UniProtKB/Swiss-Prot annotation:
It is a single-pass membrane protein. Residues 152-238 form a coiled coil. This is Single-pass membrane and coiled-coil domain-containing protein 2. The keyword Cytoplasm does not apply. Keywords: Coiled coil, Membrane, Transmembrane, Transmembrane helix. The chain crosses the membrane at residues 284-304.
């Protein structure tokens, strides 16, 4: 392969495009890993909340009537008491319509009922959150997996293209090295590259043009021969028609003898002239001979002088007769000048 500036520009543009694609893919991969880190953090937060809820449930069963000393448990108990107060307000509205009962057992049962309801509500809310986060994380994981697969495929394609470009560049460099070696060898030999290449190109062009001319002339000769053969066939058909017309003229003469009152002009129009057809045939035959002779002479003069003696006569007469003719012709062609030469 020949190394040209256009090829180099194309290779550089391909490498620039591949670098841009690699940068885009690295950005996508970074975003993918960031999303994975975010989802992992969310999962860890959810697990922490679940663990906290489990601890709260365990402690609520053991510490229903005992106040906690730690500030964290106090904060959780405050939240539980606020929720209990709201629930107690709702229950007080309902209890106004009912019968009056002792305050101490009613308060204890309402507190236990409110705690159980609060725990159930908290658990339901946590389960709903967990389901929501699970579905959301599953969708994100699917999207990220598809993006990751697309990114890996694109990276593989880019790597393949890079390998192909590297191979092409290596081959071009090898070609350049071989050309440099050849040029150095030619310079050592003292040959002019420009002159040698120009002469070779000129000779090739001349040979190609001569071949074209020969082919065109042969095609023209074939066409002319075909046209002449077609015309000869037409004239043969016309000659046959004239013979048939002559037989018809004899019949017409007999009819004239039978019908003397018929007009002579009508019969003369039917009988075609005899001499014109033969004259046309002779003219065409002479033209055909002239064309063939001129074509052979042109071919002998411009292309091959031994065409008749080495090809045509061998095919027409045979090798034996041609050798006999050569032996008969040799004494007339050889000049006896040995006596005139100095001894």
């Amino acid at each position: 392969m020949a190394l040209t500036p256009t090829n180099l520009n194309n290779k550089m543009s391909l490498q620039m495009k591949m670098d841009c694609q690699e940068q885009q893919l690295t950005k996508k991969n970074n975003g993918f890993f960031q999303k994975l880190n975010v989802t992992e953090g969310a999962m860890q937060d959810l697990l922490k909340e679940i663990i906290k809820v489990d601890h709260i449930l365990d402690r609520s069963d053991d510490e229903d009537d005992i106040s906690s000393e730690n500030p964290q448990t106090d904060f959780l108990h405050k939240g539980m008491l606020e929720l209990e107060a709201e629930h107690d307000q709702d229950l007080s509205k309902q209890d106004k319509q009912e019968t009056d009962v002792d305050e101490d057992p009613q308060a204890s049962t309402s507190l236990q009922f409110s705690k159980k309801n609060l725990l159930e509500l908290c658990l339901k809310g946590m389960f709903l959150k967990l389901n929501y986060w699970n579905t959301k994380i599953g969708l994100q994981v699917k999207e990220l997996g598809a993006d990751y697969i697309d990114g890996t495929e694109k990276i593989d394609n880019i790597i393949k293209k890079i390998n192909v470009t590297e191979n092409t560049v290596k081959s071009l460099l090898k070609d350049m090295l071989t050309l440099k070696g050849q040029i150095e060898k030619l310079e050592d030999r003292g040959l002019d590259l420009d002159q040698g290449t120009s002469t070779e190109v000129n000779t090739c062009n001349e040979v190609y043009e001569l071949k074209k001319k020969v082919i065109e002339r042969l095609e023209d000769l074939c066409k002319n021969v075909e046209l002449l053969s077609a015309k000869l066939r037409m004239y043969q058909m016309e000659a046959e028609d004239t013979d048939s017309h002559s037989s018809e003229e004899i019949d017409t003469e007999e009819m004239e003898a039978l019908l003397p009152q018929a007009p002579a002009s009508f019969l003369v129009q039917k009988s075609p002239p005899r001499n014109t057809a033969w004259k046309r045939a002779l003219r065409i035959f002479i033209m055909f001979d002239v064309l063939t002779v001129t074509g052979l002479l042109c071919y002998i003069l411009f292309f091959g002088a031994t065409f008749l003696f080495e090809r045509v006569l061998l095919r027409m007469l045979g090798c034996r007769t041609t050798w006999d003719l050569r032996e008969m012709r040799e004494p007339f062609l050889n000049l006896e000048v040995e006596a005139l030469l100095p001894s």
